[in-house]
Structure formats: C-alpha cells, structure tokens
C-alpha cells in the first residue's frame, strides 16, 4: 500500500509539472508584440533622414547664409542655411548604417540643431567677425592672426567637454557639446575657412551659396564607410584628425575661388566634411562606450 501511495503522489507531481511546463510554453508563444518591438533598435527620426536627402525643413531656426544682422555685414560663416545639418544628418545616417542603432539616434535632432548654434549671431560669432570659425593649418591661426580662438581649438574643446559630460551622466549636455563641435569640424573642411579667406577678401559667400544649393549632389557612395575610416578615427588624436582635414580643405582653395571648378571643390569639401564629422562622432562614441 505504501508503495502504491508513493507512486500515486509521484504521478500527481509529474502531472502538475507537465501542466506548469505547458503554461510556460504557451506564455512564451503568446508573448505580447510589444515585448519584441521593445528590443528593436531605435532608428533615426524621419526628419533627420529627410534632411540628409536634401529637405529644407531643418531643425531649429537655422542660420542665414549671409549674416545681415552682423554689424559689419561682411562676414559669412561656414555652415549656412542647410549645409551644416545636411552634413551632420548624413554622418549620423552612415554611422547608423555601419555601426547600428545607439543613443545617437534618439539624440539626433538635438545634434542637428546644435550644429547650427555657433552661427547664430551672439552665440559664438566673435563680435560679428566669426574669427573663431577659421583655421589655417599652416599657421595655426584664424583670419585675424590669432592662435585662439580657431575652428580647430573649438572642435577639440567641445569634443573633450562632450566626453566628460557623458562620462558624468549628463547625456543631453554631451550631445549639445558634440553637436556644437561638429559645426567647427564642418567649417575647417571648407576651403575658405581653412585658408583664412573671408567674405571681405574673397568669393567666400558666393561659393557657400553654390554649395548649399547643390548639396544633394554631394553624397557618400552607399552611405557607408570602410573599416579603414573607423580605424583611423580610433587611432588618430582629434587634433591631428582636424589638422589633416584642414590641410585637405586648404588644398582646394584655388578651385573654390574659380566658378568653373565650384562643383568639384564643393563635392570634395562636402564629402570630406561628412567623413570627418562621422569620424569625430564615432571617436566620441568609442571613447564613452556608445560603440
């Protein structure tokens, strides 16, 4: 009798275990759809993608091609109407394609808006001279002959500030800094900015208007970079990266001053800017653990 009762108890326990297992399996198969979608990567906002494809609907108020409010009314900054956000949005799109989704996607709008911030009169416009938006890699000076501020120094400073802020847990502040930094990265990829050619002594404004109008013709093949670009970003100091980019930009100064070669100069400048901004953001991401 004792053996029979033990067998009955064991059989009952096995049945209960089977029922529980069945419930678990049913629960897994009937898991709500949101439990799957919650794990899906966050894509870039549609507006960022639209800007990268040439939409004029940019984030924020933007910055005018010519700063008519400027007391001097002579200087024009490097990132104008749509060009800066076009460059940054393409960099973010490429990073998403090559490295996958990250917090940069959810903060993409902020980065895009802050890339225009330094061009808004009164923010970081150097009393209307925009001197700190220039950087000649051969002299290390801006158009006023000063070693500081320059586009290189500001891009480096914002990079370090972004790293420190992110590591301290201030994600939004870090994205603000990296956004502002990308402005100067783009500036020093523009031939006039890398040659200290202002709107007073050159065709600076005319060339930038041309580039802004034709920006959608200047793209990165496949919206992707090879591993060598990312390896270079990881293994090159920020300052050295910016110096090299400015050297390449300065080499295009002659072409950028000749209307017959505007298109070639614009194409190379914008492509180089997208690449350098991508490397700048990627290096930041690697240093703080985003990638």
Indicate residue ranges for each PLM-predicted region.
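Short, Lys/Arg-enriched N-terminal segments with co-localized hydrophobic residues
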Residues: 1-11
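Intrinsic disorder/low-complexity segments enriched in polar/small residues
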Residues: 7-9, 17, 41, 47
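Short alpha-helical segments used as structural interaction elements across diverse proteins
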Residues: 10-13, 81
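Sec-dependent N-terminal signal peptides of Gram-positive bacterial secreted proteins and lipoproteins
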Residues: 15-35
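N-terminal, motif-rich segments that launch catalysis or mediate targeting to/interaction with membranes
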Residues: 34-176, 191-291
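Short alpha-helix carrying the canonical HExxH Zn2+-binding catalytic motif
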Residues: 174-186
């Amino acid at each position: 009798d004792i053996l029979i009762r033990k067998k009955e108890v064991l059989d009952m326990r096995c049945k209960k275990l089977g029922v529980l297992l069945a419930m678990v399996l049913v629960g897994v198969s009937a898991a709500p759809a949101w439990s799957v979608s919650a794990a899906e990567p966050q894509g870039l906002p549609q507006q960022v993608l639209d800007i990268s494809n040439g939409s004029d609907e940019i984030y924020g108020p933007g910055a005018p091609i010519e700063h008519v409010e400027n007391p001097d009314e002579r200087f024009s900054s490097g990132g104008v109407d749509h060009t800066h956000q076009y460059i940054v949005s393409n960099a973010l799109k490429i990073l998403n394609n090559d490295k996958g989704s990250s917090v940069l996607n959810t903060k993409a709008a902020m980065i895009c808006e802050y890339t225009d911030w330094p061009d808004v009169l009164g923010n970081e416009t150097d009393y209307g001279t925009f001197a700190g938006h220039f950087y000649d890699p051969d002299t290390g000076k801006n158009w006023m002959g000063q070693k500081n501020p320059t586009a290189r120094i500001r891009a480096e400073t914002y990079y370090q500030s972004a790293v420190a802020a992110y590591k301290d847990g201030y994600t939004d502040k870090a994205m603000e800094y990296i956004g502002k930094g990308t402005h100067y990265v783009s500036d020093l990829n523009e031939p006039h900015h890398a040659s200290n050619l202002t709107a007073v002594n050159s065709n600076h404004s005319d060339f930038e208007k041309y580039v802004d109008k034709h920006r959608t013709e200047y793209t990165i093949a496949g919206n992707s970079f090879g591993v060598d670009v990312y390896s270079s970003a990881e293994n090159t100091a920020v300052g050295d990266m910016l110096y090299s980019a400015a050297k390449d930009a300065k080499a295009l100064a002659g072409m950028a001053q000749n209307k017959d070669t505007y298109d070639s100069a614009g194409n190379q400048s914008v492509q180089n800017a997208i690449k350098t901004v991508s490397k700048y953001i990627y290096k930041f991401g690697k240093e703080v653990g985003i990638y």
